[in-house]
Curated annotation (Swiss-Prot):
Pfam families: zf-MYND (PF01753). The lineage of its organism: Eukaryota, Fungi, Dikarya, Ascomycota, Pezizomycotina. GO terms for molecular function: zinc ion binding. This is MYND-type zinc finger protein samB. Gene3D superfamilies: 6.10.140.2220. Its main location: cytoplasm. It comes from Aspergillus oryzae (strain ATCC 42149 / RIB 40) (Yellow koji mold). Residues 133-241, 274-349 are annotated as: Disordered. Zn(2+) binds at residues 576, 579, 597, 601.
Length: 605
């Protein structure tokens, strides 16, 4: 039986391929890597621009073939990695831009296990990098400060929260009467702004000057120490910052600039008088493939003012209510008042102070920042404020000329990255991947298999568009990991002094149980040490989990992933008092879910 590399001699073709004007399903069955890459490159353009091609791929087995390419794993060969990245890009285009039926076919083609494996690999790499950074930091401090090593070890080894009695004393001392009022001159009322005392307020809204120092005014001092002093002060600053309710979820320099009063940003004080700047901040592209406009040079003052990223409630997707994945009733502000409803409310305090010390320790352990890794947000250093990956076709002739000469690509970044496109922001590699790259002991072939930031971003966005259909929720809550995509073996090779590991026997994917829930994996990306784009799309996915199932009478599911209980009738479960979106069947479920829910719980006006 002949191979599927159908040759066409009369047109001088060695194999059937897909072009920007012709789609041929046989090209996806090609066994040679180079013509398959060429076909996938053109297919990525077609899936972006043609709804007809997306519909055809759902009925001719094209999606299943693309998923099979993804499940074969990411090889260390550059061409194989290029093929994998292009196939993944095609599937994301189909799911993001397709209709409801097309998105349903993407989920039914078993794409969810691929996404779950990508997210799980990224979390494992982050944990490994932070563990190594902490160990190196401890060795470094003990070597340079031998006398102070016991004290430093005492600080790092102590739980983030002290015992209950000391915690009560701390809480009591914070609630003492404020000092006398401070007279603020009238001319300062227009140029200064005090930090908000509400620990739950995360948005950037206009605030009135305060007559007394806020409780969290010490954050300016802690942030100052955080940048100017050594590692011992840094540990202490993290410990005191953890004492504040929900203060760990806020960047210290964004909470208070200076020691009390700071100038009001133009975007906070006069949003209506600056329509151009305001629209530029809150705008969202139709999809990750929408190119940006020409970059306009801006002054340093304008750049620093525009770097203030809007909150998740202020961001809207321009693709419409049906495609933004935000769920029903998305909030766009952060007002203090909320409408009265007849539904029961679970009564948690504004500070959400959970009394169990063990729960607090778990909360901090899950989101503690590494003191050696500096996590920089790529989106804050770019002109564009939103996630944008441009798909370029070969019509302009630049993608082949630029990418084929890129043979020494570092970190396993595929040649599909359009780094020379001036209209699209360059995606900065993950700081965790850069951490491993800077260590010369790490083999290069191990780095090539590490998950990339753009893969995680596209995975989260694809989930945001397909997870809003309640009839597909079982695919997300009962999934598995793809064995050939795991990076466990590569992570074991990163251990110091580890000997070469023999490859274990490959597991058959069809024999694996569907015991993986993808929502807890996604919820980990709502933590602040991830980039703003990852947080945004992860929050959209988690809000989709709170949607009511209209096919079952409009009932909702308990938002705690270990519970999963459904309502027997409408409005049986109580909503979270703050966001009024998540529902819990009991106080215990809400308390257990608050460990990560606090990162995507936002006040409803």
């Amino acid at each position: 039986m002949r191979e599927v590399n159908f040759s066409i001699p009369n047109v001088n073709k060695a194999s059937v391929n897909i072009t920007t004007t012709l789609y041929d399903r046989r090209a996806l069955d090609c066994t040679s890597t180079l013509p398959l890459i060429n076909s996938l490159n053109h297919l990525a353009y077609l899936t972006t621009s043609s709804a007809r091609i997306r519909d055809i791929l759902t009925v001719d087995g094209g999606i299943e073939r693309l998923v099979c390419i993804l499940k074969e794993g990411r090889s260390r060969d550059l061409m194989e990695m290029w093929k994998w990245s292009l196939a993944f890009q095609c599937v994301v285009n189909i799911g993001v831009r397709g209709s409801e039926s097309v998105r349903t076919r993407v989920v039914e083609a078993d794409m969810v296990p691929v996404i779950a494996t990508i997210l799980d690999n990224y979390i494992k790499v982050v944990d490994k990098a932070r563990a190594r950074a902490d160990s190196e930091n401890q060795r470094h401090s003990s070597r340079h400060h031998p006398k102070a090593a016991p004290a430093a070890g005492d600080v790092t080894g102590r739980p983030s929260f002290p015992d209950q009695s000391s915690n009560s004393e701390q809480r009591t001392s914070r609630r003492q009467a404020p000092p006398p009022s401070i007279e603020i001159p009238a001319f300062l009322h227009q140029n200064t702004n005090a930090p908000d005392t509400n620990a739950m307020d995360v948005t950037s809204s206009p605030r009135a000057p305060m007559t007394s120092p806020p409780e969290r005014s010490t954050f300016g001092q802690e942030a100052h120490i955080h940048r100017s002093h050594d590692g011992r002060h840094l540990h202490t600053g993290h410990r005191h910052r953890a004492m504040q309710p929900l203060a760990t979820a806020l960047p210290p320099m964004d909470t208070a600039d200076g020691f009390g009063l700071r100038p009001v940003r133009d975007t906070e004080r006069l949003p209506s008088m600056l329509p151009t700047l305001h629209n530029g901040i809150t705008s969202q592209p139709d999809s990750p493939t929408t190119p940006n406009g020409p970059v306009q040079p801006r002054s340093h003052a304008q750049t620093s003012a525009a770097r203030q990223r809007p909150t998740l409630r202020q961001q809207q997707s321009a693709s419409g209510d049906s495609d933004d994945g935000n769920g029903e009733g998305s909030t766009l502000g952060d007002n203090a008042g909320s409408a009265e409803t007849s539904e029961p409310i679970v009564g948690l305090q504004n500070e959400m102070e959970i009394d169990e010390v063990s729960d607090r320790q778990t909360m901090i352990d899950g989101v503690s920042n590494s003191h050696d890794l500096t996590v920089t947000d790529p989106s804050e250093s770019q002109e564009a404020e939103t996630f944008n990956i441009s798909h370029r076709s070969t019509v302009d002739g630049s993608i082949i000329n630029n990418d084929t000469t890129q043979t020494n690509t570092a970190l396993g970044l595929s040649p599909t990255q359009a780094a020379n496109n001036a209209n699209s922001p360059a995606l900065v590699p993950s700081p965790y991947t850069l951490y491993f790259r800077d260590r010369s002991a790490v083999p290069q072939n191990v780095l090539t298999t590490m998950p990339r930031d753009e893969d995680v971003l596209m995975s989260l966005q694809l989930l945001a568009y397909v997870s809003k259909y309640c009839n597909l929720r079982s695919y997300f809550q009962h999934s598995h990991l793809v064995p050939k995509l795991k990076v466990d073996r590569e992570l074991q090779m990163l251990e110091e002094g580890a000997s070469p590991i023999e490859p274990p026997e490959e597991e058959e994917e069809y024999m694996l149980p569907d015991d993986v829930n993808i929502f807890p994996l996604v919820e980990k990306f709502t933590v602040r040490h991830h980039s703003k784009d990852m947080q945004y799309w992860a929050c959209v996915v988690m809000r989709n989990l709170c949607r009511k199932d209209e096919s079952r009478g409009g009932i909702r599911q308990c938002a705690y992933y270990k519970c999963g209980k459904w309502e027997e009738f409408q409005r049986q479960f109580a909503k979270c008092r703050r966001c009024r979106r998540t529902k819990y069947c009991s106080k215990d479920c809400q308390k257990a879910a608050w460990v990560y829910h606090r990162h995507w719980c936002h006040t409803t006006p």
